[in-house]
Amino acid sequence: MGSSKSKPKDPSQRRRSLEPPDSTHHGGFPASQTPNKTAAPDTHRTPSRSFGTVATELKLFGDFNTSDTVTSPQRAGALAGSVTTFGTRESRIETDLSFKKRERLQIVNNTEGTWWLAHSLTTGQTGYIPSNYVAPSDSIQAEEWYFGKITRRESGRLLLNPENPRGTFLVRESETTKGAYCLSVSDFDNAKGLNVKHYKIRKLDSGGFYITSRTQFSSLQQLVAYYSKHADGLCHRLTNVCPTSKPQTQGLAKDAWEIPRESLRLEVKLGQGYFGEVWMGTWNGTTRVAIKTLKPGTMSPEAFLQEAQVMKKLRHEKLVQLYAMVSEEPIYIVIEYMSKGSLLDFLKGEMGKYLRLPQLVEMAAQIASGMAYVERMNYVHRDLRAANILVGENLVCKVADFGLARLIEDNEYTARPGARFPVKWTAPEAALYGRFTIKSDVWSFGILLTELTTKGRVPYPGMVNGEVLDRVERGYRMPCPPECPESLHDLMCQCWRKDPEERPTFEYLQAQLLPACVLKIAE
């Protein structure tokens, strides 16, 4: 993808079009991935400016460690020899290796990136496997209940799923004591409701482990087995291992970026726009995907494929993943399917009424995590809003719709005259003069926070685009939404500072969005 160089700042640049975008997302594609049941036819890092203008850090929801980051379980390193799988996976193409959960494999070649050649000691077959599905045999990393280096916050998000029974648990590394571990357990009582307890697992000089010194174990496996039978001081005995999503593979399979059209089956239309459609479908009869199509003649193929090139370069657990593409017309872009659709639809739907502030703040933290990565990679999204965030299982949120994203040089990208963008979400310097930076994305994030706290209300209610721009230029900012803490509104207002350089970084924003009130710390 060719990067767009920044233009000189010129106050005389004419104002941009105030035409609102279509109700669909950029390029006329629908933002939602919520099925409407239409049947298918058969057929180098750039340093960010540090945010140092705030004298004291915000404590939005209690004093909590601001070094936390949202991460997923990281279990596999550069392994060799015998490994054990911690998930079941069916082969997707002929060169793949199918395996069952806790199957032993021998690694044959681990020098080809994220796809390794392995031999099954059970079936005798050989093929490629995703490296993040395995761990050294007989190691703690191979245990289903071991989640490694995830944070307190992430463990809380996973365990607070209402479908988890009392006693659902996981073991993770301690964030405060090197070499120690933490047992996180879901609990419920009428006073507190669903909550999480965290118990520090200490290590003996002799190599054993204990939670209370009166009961000691030679291994973590023995500790887990004991507390699965006896509560013995815990809030509840251990019942179920905390469920988590399958590890995300890089691409659909090894060397499967360009795929044949016939390998895709379009099944349910999720929406359509002027330039094309989005479908839920299946690849190779094995893998659920979302497929973006382009109507021939409505847009240059090069412009459409530009989104795929951006997504291929930007890879992070909080960004929707590009899987593959069909680059001959009609062009298809194959991306990760997110089962709950757009965040906007999710907030306004049946599930939205059950979301409470801690969950909304956690969702905001996930979005900030994804955008902090975009920030580090020196890109600008340009269309950050709830309609362009997708939601999956367990309230996982990922930034999507990179059709307007650009690599920025000299910290600024200037849009072409006449470019259209969502005015109510766009920073004044971008809406009026087309000057986009990561700081204009920060402004948009502040607007997105209002969407979260109001369960999807349109920003600046009762105002048209021209009125919004005029009043914002004269200093107007939206008031604190109902039931929103003043400290969170203060964070929004930091995002809406007139001088872009005085707005916070996404890294800072992520650190401030710490829903400590949802975690009942017992360690």
UniProtKB/Swiss-Prot annotation:
<feature type="binding site">
    <location>
        <position position="292"/>
    </location>
    <ligand>
        <name>ATP</name>
    </ligand>
</feature>
<dbReference type="InterPro" id="IPR011009">
    <property type="entry name" value="Kinase-like_dom_sf"/>
</dbReference>
<feature type="modified residue" description="Phosphotyrosine; by autocatalysis">
    <location>
        <position position="413"/>
    </location>
</feature>
<feature type="active site" description="Proton acceptor">
    <location>
        <position position="383"/>
    </location>
</feature>
<keyword id="KW-0728">SH3 domain</keyword>
<feature type="domain" description="SH3">
    <location>
        <begin position="71"/>
        <end position="139"/>
    </location>
</feature>
<dbReference type="InterPro" id="IPR000719">
    <property type="entry name" value="Prot_kinase_dom"/>
</dbReference>
<keyword id="KW-0449">Lipoprotein</keyword>
<feature type="region of interest" description="Disordered">
    <location>
        <begin position="1"/>
        <end position="50"/>
    </location>
</feature>
<dbReference type="GO" id="GO:0005524">
    <property type="term" value="F:ATP binding"/>
</dbReference>
<feature type="binding site">
    <location>
        <begin position="270"/>
        <end position="278"/>
    </location>
    <ligand>
        <name>ATP</name>
    </ligand>
</feature>
<keyword id="KW-0519">Myristate</keyword>
<dbReference type="Pfam" id="PF07714">
    <property type="entry name" value="PK_Tyr_Ser-Thr"/>
</dbReference>
<comment type="subunit">
    <text>Homodimer.</text>
</comment>
<dbReference type="InterPro" id="IPR050198">
    <property type="entry name" value="Non-receptor_tyrosine_kinases"/>
</dbReference>
<feature type="domain" description="Protein kinase">
    <location>
        <begin position="264"/>
        <end position="514"/>
    </location>
</feature>
<protein>
    <recommendedName>
        <fullName>Tyrosine-protein kinase transforming protein Src</fullName>
        <ecNumber>2.7.10.2</ecNumber>
    </recommendedName>
</protein>
<dbReference type="InterPro" id="IPR008266">
    <property type="entry name" value="Tyr_kinase_AS"/>
</dbReference>
<dbReference type="InterPro" id="IPR017441">
    <property type="entry name" value="Protein_kinase_ATP_BS"/>
</dbReference>
<dbReference type="InterPro" id="IPR001452">
    <property type="entry name" value="SH3_domain"/>
</dbReference>
<dbReference type="GO" id="GO:0004715">
    <property type="term" value="F:non-membrane spanning protein tyrosine kinase activity"/>
</dbReference>
<dbReference type="InterPro" id="IPR036028">
    <property type="entry name" value="SH3-like_dom_sf"/>
</dbReference>
<comment type="function">
    <text>This phosphoprotein, required for both the initiation and the maintenance of neoplastic transformation, is a protein kinase that catalyzes the phosphorylation of tyrosine residues in vitro.</text>
</comment>
<keyword id="KW-0418">Kinase</keyword>
<dbReference type="InterPro" id="IPR020635">
    <property type="entry name" value="Tyr_kinase_cat_dom"/>
</dbReference>
<keyword id="KW-0553">Oncogene</keyword>
<dbReference type="Pfam" id="PF00018">
    <property type="entry name" value="SH3_1"/>
</dbReference>
<dbReference type="InterPro" id="IPR001245">
    <property type="entry name" value="Ser-Thr/Tyr_kinase_cat_dom"/>
</dbReference>
<keyword id="KW-0597">Phosphoprotein</keyword>
<keyword id="KW-0067">ATP-binding</keyword>
<keyword id="KW-0727">SH2 domain</keyword>
<keyword id="KW-0808">Transferase</keyword>
<feature type="lipid moiety-binding region" description="N-myristoyl glycine; by host">
    <location>
        <position position="2"/>
    </location>
</feature>
<keyword id="KW-0547">Nucleotide-binding</keyword>
<dbReference type="InterPro" id="IPR036860">
    <property type="entry name" value="SH2_dom_sf"/>
</dbReference>
<feature type="compositionally biased region" description="Basic and acidic residues">
    <location>
        <begin position="7"/>
        <end position="25"/>
    </location>
</feature>
<comment type="similarity">
    <text>Belongs to the protein kinase superfamily. Tyr protein kinase family. SRC subfamily.</text>
</comment>
<keyword id="KW-0829">Tyrosine-protein kinase</keyword>
<dbReference type="InterPro" id="IPR000980">
    <property type="entry name" value="SH2"/>
</dbReference>
<feature type="domain" description="SH2">
    <location>
        <begin position="145"/>
        <end position="242"/>
    </location>
</feature>
<dbReference type="Pfam" id="PF00017">
    <property type="entry name" value="SH2"/>
</dbReference>
